[in-house]
Swiss-Prot record:
It comes from Gallus gallus (Chicken). One of its GO terms (cellular component) is extracellular region. Residues 54-229 form the VWFA domain. Disulfide bonds join 239-250, 246-259, 261-274, 280-291, 287-300, 302-315, 321-332, 328-341, 343-356, 362-373, 369-382, 384-397. This is Matrilin-3. Its main location: secreted. GO terms for molecular function: calcium ion binding. Can form homooligomers (monomers, dimers, trimers and tetramers) and heterooligomers with matrilin-1.
Length: 452
């Protein structure tokens, strides 16, 4: 894909001398020489700014790349990041690391500032072993260039770009995989270092090859390529020049521009003006139950009796009677998504519907005893008045009969008493007879004395 240059100053920046330590691809595919005046863009910077990209670096860390050389690659990545207009609405960057396996160091959605990206790059470790370049390109399509991983939708018209850095020959099939990637709209730049196979680089890269294939002799000068890529990604910045008609946000796009809106607004059909959106309108949010608008964005909440799940979208019914979730003094009874309080047996719920008080179990209406209620702590037993006995149901009473009041033991006692009483009576009668006889004899004696 041929790149339009923004201004005359930007064009002049391309025509710099060739570095002694680096050479271009073979003559029939030669690019403009790599410049020695790197980083000197002067006034061109004000009107020449890299256009928004979804940019993925795929770096070879196979066994042929020595540790000190891999550190040079990381320096190259950091310098590339410094030249980019990084941000959520501008250029997004991902880094993949490959050898015999592929590792996504960070996808497009992870970092939107240069400092965080460069810190993540500094922590990358080589994988060693083989050079599975085709596997890495396929992984970029399957695992990185997806909306879930931060790639912007097709209607945003943001270019998808891959920069592959390798020093060897691929050990797997790359031609078909690279062709599929290009067909999917991915622009591929191939950077060869040292022993890199030039034919493989040309097979991978997009057309025209003289704009998409780069070669340097050593990793020691790879960072010099940052200038070439900056020039490649440079576009006339209509947004910076202020010659656009966007109401809110202007986004540079491959020499042109697109209009966008602030968060909480949506672009109108005229593609220039914006209208505020109801982020909680049906179909605009992912909340399971309640959507709460929050400064152009939204947060999800749940109905009473439900709790928000870790995904911050869906809700689950909570156990409202779990410890710490209710204020019942004794018993919590779940009632749908709410609860009510109750009390243990022997207690009654107070008017506050939370606390409990002990009840008089023998108070009228609280027991089923027919005659006498006897309180026993929180419980009671029934009893009867004198002359009544408790029935087997332990509640009602029946009048006691005489026979039922005398036990066998008491009957024996009665017989013994009766016998004793008979014996005493008999003796008293005998004694009385004796006393009568003595009294008669005494009277007769007294009579005789009077006669004398």
């Amino acid at each position: 894909m041929r790149r339009a240059l923004g201004t005359l100053g930007c064009c002049l920046a391309l025509l710099l001398p060739l570095l002694p330590a680096a050479r271009g691809v073979p003559h029939r595919h030669r690019r403009q020489p790599l410049g020695s005046g790197l980083g000197r863009h002067g006034a061109a910077d004000t009107a020449c700014k890299n256009r928004p990209l979804d940019l993925v670096f795929i770096i070879d860390s196979s066994r042929s790349v020595r540790p000190e050389e891999f550190e040079k690659v990381k320096i190259f990545l950091s310098k590339m990041i410094d030249t980019l207009d990084v941000g959520e609405r501008t250029t997004r960057v991902a880094v993949m690391n490959y050898a015999s396996t592929v590792k996504v160091e960070f996808p497009l959605r992870t970092y939107f500032d240069k400092a965080s990206m460069k810190e993540a790059v500094s922590r990358i470790q080589p994988l060693s072993a083989g050079t599975m370049t085709g596997l890495a390109i396929q992984a970029a399509m399957d695992e990185v260039f997806t909306e879930e991983m931060g790639t912007r939708p097709a209607n945003f018209n943001i270019p998808k770009v891959v920069i592959i850095v390798t020093d060897g020959r691929p050990q797997d099939q790359v031609e078909n995989v690279a062709a599929n990637a290009r067909t999917a709209g991915i622009e591929i730049y191939a950077v060869g270092v040292g022993r890199a196979d030039m034919q493989s680089l040309r097979i991978m890269a997009s057309e025209p090859l003289d704009e998409h294939v780069f070669y340097v002799e050593t990793y020691g000068v790879i960072e010099k390529l940052t200038s070439k890529f900056r020039e490649t990604f440079c576009a006339a910045n209509t947004c910076a020049l202020g010659t656009h008609d966007c109401e809110q946000v202007c986004v540079s796009n491959d020499g042109s521009y697109l209009c966008d809106c602030y968060e909480g607004y949506t672009l109108n059909p005229d593609k220039r003006t914006c209208s505020a959106v109801d982020v909680c309108a049906p179909g605009r949010h992912e909340c399971d139950q309640i959507c709460v608008s929050n400064n152009g964005s939204y947060v999800c909440e749940c109905f009473e009796g439900y709790t928000l799940n870790p995904d911050k979208k869906t809700c689950s019914a909570m156990d409202v009677c779990a410890p710490g979730r209710h204020d019942c003094a004794q018993v919590c009874r779940r009632n749908g998504g709410s609860y009510s309080c109750d009390c243990f047996e022997g207690f009654t719920l107070n008017p506050d519907k939370k606390t409990c008080s002990a009840v008089d179990v023998c108070a009228p209406g609280r027991h089923d005893c027919e005659q006498v209620c006897v309180r026993d702590d929180l419980f009671y037993t029934c009893d009867c008045y004198q002359g009544y006995v408790l029935n087997p149901d332990k509640k009602t009473c029946s009048r006691a009969t005489t026979s039922s009041l005398v036990t066998d033991e008491e009957a024996c006692k009665c017989e013994a008493i009766a016998a004793l009483q008979d014996s005493v009576t008999s003796r008293l009668e005998a004694l009385s007879t004796k006393l009568d006889e003595v009294s008669q004899k005494l009277q007769a004696y007294q009579d005789r004395q009077q006669v004398v």
